[in-house]
Amino acid sequence: MLYALQWRKYMVEENNNEELRHLVRIMNTDLQGAKPVQYALTGLPGVGRRTAKLIAKGAGVDPSAILGYLPEEEVAKLDTAIGKFEDIVPSWMLNRQKDLATGQDKHLLGTDILLTFREDINNLKKVRAYRGLRHERGLKVRGQRTKSTGRRGSTVGVSRKK
């Protein structure tokens, strides 16, 4: 059985006749070309390991192939498979189910995740929901205890008797 470093060395030796692209651009994001496809795709916000493996299989690309050695056609296949990910998987695998505005199931990728998350928190603050108030005050939101933990800032310390 080959360990991870041995496997990478084996893959590099196998493909040494081609030039390794160290950065591969997919969905306006630079991904590491030295990693296997299933791990390199996790560099996209909104794509985890399981999602990346499904995207690679949906595109017809070997998930264990090194991303930097893939030809441009296969990289383009990966790009289109990422766009069609919502159609391939069941709704419970998507990261935005029953969107508040549209009611649709979506899978957000890239900067859309950050913008939507920030928008949701601002909406909670605007309607003065309990969670929104906790976010405003910088306190814990999910019901954790706050008597002794979660204290931030510099420690005061105890003054010594003279």
Curated annotation (Swiss-Prot):
<dbReference type="Pfam" id="PF00416">
    <property type="entry name" value="Ribosomal_S13"/>
</dbReference>
<dbReference type="GO" id="GO:0015935">
    <property type="term" value="C:small ribosomal subunit"/>
</dbReference>
<dbReference type="InterPro" id="IPR019977">
    <property type="entry name" value="Ribosomal_uS13_archaeal"/>
</dbReference>
<keyword id="KW-0687">Ribonucleoprotein</keyword>
<dbReference type="InterPro" id="IPR027437">
    <property type="entry name" value="Rbsml_uS13_C"/>
</dbReference>
<dbReference type="InterPro" id="IPR018269">
    <property type="entry name" value="Ribosomal_uS13_CS"/>
</dbReference>
<dbReference type="InterPro" id="IPR010979">
    <property type="entry name" value="Ribosomal_uS13-like_H2TH"/>
</dbReference>
<dbReference type="GO" id="GO:0019843">
    <property type="term" value="F:rRNA binding"/>
</dbReference>
<keyword id="KW-0694">RNA-binding</keyword>
<protein>
    <recommendedName>
        <fullName>Small ribosomal subunit protein uS13</fullName>
    </recommendedName>
</protein>
<comment type="similarity">
    <text>Belongs to the universal ribosomal protein uS13 family.</text>
</comment>
<comment type="subunit">
    <text>Part of the 30S ribosomal subunit. Forms a loose heterodimer with protein S19. Forms two bridges to the 50S subunit in the 70S ribosome.</text>
</comment>
<dbReference type="GO" id="GO:0005829">
    <property type="term" value="C:cytosol"/>
</dbReference>
<feature type="region of interest" description="Disordered">
    <location>
        <begin position="142"/>
        <end position="162"/>
    </location>
</feature>
<dbReference type="GO" id="GO:0003735">
    <property type="term" value="F:structural constituent of ribosome"/>
</dbReference>
<keyword id="KW-0699">rRNA-binding</keyword>
<comment type="function">
    <text>Located at the top of the head of the 30S subunit, it contacts several helices of the 16S rRNA. In the 70S ribosome it contacts the 23S rRNA (bridge B1a) and protein L5 of the 50S subunit (bridge B1b), connecting the 2 subunits; these bridges are implicated in subunit movement.</text>
</comment>
<keyword id="KW-0689">Ribosomal protein</keyword>
<dbReference type="GO" id="GO:0006412">
    <property type="term" value="P:translation"/>
</dbReference>
<dbReference type="InterPro" id="IPR001892">
    <property type="entry name" value="Ribosomal_uS13"/>
</dbReference>
